[in-house]
From Swiss-Prot:
The lineage of its organism: Eukaryota, Metazoa, Ecdysozoa, Arthropoda, Chelicerata. Disulfide bonds join 2-19, 5-28, 16-33, 20-35. Toxin with unknown function in healthy organisms. On glioma cells, interacts with chloride channels (probably ClC-3/CLCN3) and MMP2 at the surface of glioma cells. This complex is then internalized via caveolae, thus inhibiting the chloride channels necessary for cell shrinkage and tumor propagation. GO terms for cellular component: extracellular region. It comes from Leiurus hebraeus (Hebrew deathstalker scorpion). Keywords: Chloride channel impairing toxin, Disulfide bond, Ion channel impairing toxin, Knottin, Secreted, Toxin, Voltage-gated chloride channel impairing toxin. Expressed by the venom gland. This is Toxin Lqh 8/6.
Length: 38
């Protein structure tokens, strides 16, 4: 499960991406990363 995310974090996109296993893109919809195959 992803750690809490913050839209103010410049690295959040990468963190969510890594959290989602690098598949598709992990996007931050505070307060959590959403793993969607965009």
């Amino acid at each position: 499960r992803c750690s809490p995310c913050f839209t103010t974090d410049q690295q959040m996109t990468k963190k969510c991406y890594d959290c989602c296993g690098g598949k598709g893109k992990g996007k931050c919809y505070g307060p959590q990363c959403i793993c969607a195959p965009y």
